[in-house]
Curated annotation (Swiss-Prot):
Location in or out of the cell: Cytoplasm
Organism: Xylella fastidiosa (strain Temecula1 / ATCC 700964)
GO cellular component labels: cytoplasm
Family under the similarity heading: Belongs to the ferrochelatase family.
Xref: PANTHER family: FERROCHELATASE, FERROCHELATASE, MITOCHONDRIAL
Name used for this protein in its record: Ferrochelatase
Catalytic activity: heme b + 2 H(+) = protoporphyrin IX + Fe(2+)
Pfam families: Ferrochelatase (PF00762)
Binding annotation for Fe cation: H194, E275
One annotated GO biological process: heme biosynthetic process
Main location: cytoplasm
Pathway: Porphyrin-containing compound metabolism; protoheme biosynthesis; protoheme from protoporphyrin-IX: step 1/1
Cited function: Catalyzes the ferrous insertion into protoporphyrin IX.
UniProt xrefs under CDD domains: Ferrochelatase_C, Ferrochelatase_N
Length: 320
């Protein structure tokens, strides 16, 4: 990497606890669930509920789930995000490359400050959310915009999303093909995306349309017809209605209709994390097995070279 470069790429992921412990999970969830982009309930009502009820309950529960998927190097989300950044330095030798988290460490603002201290004058921000949402990408943009107001001398370009980027679509399709070549092909492929409340979509969030675009393009790259794949939304939280169809009940219904073998991929996640490894790969598989069906999870792109190359291309095209 050219350490005299005045151009940088900062990739940003959601975040993760620093350890699979109740205390670390409470700290992380406390920050995450305090973001008004994520939870829009008035703080007067939400903060007491969050700190007196939700965090004391979810902290220990989530910690036990994180422990199931924790790697020797740390949280999967953190490990794979760091590896992507390391891979990007090979594709962008004249750039500085850094990584940050929206919640937790390494903190986004601190990463921006560090780049400025290195005399960087142009920064491309790449949120690792393929499909734009006001609950994810826009939250990153909020922090970046606030930082830019006090650092006007740095030119910042923020990539909105890459839901239909040809190189990214090709990378996802190729990973599915490799899985089929190694394990055979199932009867049905599910594209499972993280859900969000239906009211958010009703207020104009384009996320469900972006998910549909991604799934359709990947299916087309695989030459699948409409009967061979299905889209679902996972990770519902709370009692209100979220985007439908819900992924797990959809799989159950398909199993009850006679389908016995499923493949599942999560194209809304750039790297594997709690939701993909514990909720989906372990959880969905167990509940389907109880219904006489099997599900094979296809990992996220993680630090796949084709993924890294696609992200490098996005960064290069982002600058005027």
């Amino acid at each position: 990497m050219n350490h005299t470069s005045d151009t940088a790429l900062l990739i940003v992921n959601l975040g993760t606890p620093e350890a699979p412990t109740a205390a670390a999970v409470r700290r992380y969830l406390g920050e995450f669930l305090s973001d008004r982009r994520v939870v829009s309930i008035p703080p007067l009502f939400w903060k007491p509920l969050l700190h007196m009820v939700i965090l004391p309950i979810r902290g220990p529960r989530s910690a036990s789930k994180y422990a199931k998927v924790w790697l020797q190097e740390g949280s999967p989300l953190s490990v794979y995000t760091r590896r992507i950044a390391e891979g990007l330095t090979q594709h962008l030798p004249d750039w500085r490359v850094a990584w940050a988290m929206r919640y937790g460490a390494p903190a986004l603002t601190k990463a921006l400050d560090a780049l400025q201290a290195q005399q960087v004058r142009r920064i491309v921000i790449l949120p690792l959310y393929p499909q734009y949402s006001t609950t994810t990408t826009a939250s990153v943009q909020d922090v970046v915009e606030a930082w830019c107001k006090r650092t006007p001398q740095v030119q910042v370009e923020c990539i909105q999303d890459y839901a239909e980027d040809p190189a990214w679509v090709a990378a996802v399709a190729a990973s599915i093909r490799r899985h089929w070549q190694a394990h055979g092909r199932s009867e049905k492929l599910m594209f499972s995306f993280h859900g969000l409340p239906q009211r958010v979509a009703n207020n104009g969030d384009p996320y469900p349309q972006r998910c549909q675009v991604s799934a359709s393009l990947i299916a087309a790259a695989l030459n699948l017809n409409e009967s061979e794949w299905v889209l679902g939304y996972q990770s519902r939280f709370g009692a209100e209605r979220w985007l439908q169809p819900y992924a797990e009940p959809t799989l159950w219904a398909l199993a009850e209709s006679g389908i016995r073998r499923f493949d599942l991929v999560c194209p809304g996640f750039s790297v594997d994390c709690l939701e993909t490894l514990e909720e989906v790969a372990l959880g969905f598989s167990e509940t389907l097995a109880a219904r006489g069906a099997t599900m094979r999870y296809i990992p996220c792109l993680n630090d796949d070279p084709a993924h890294v190359q696609a992200l490098a291309g996005l960064a290069q095209r982002a600058l005027p």
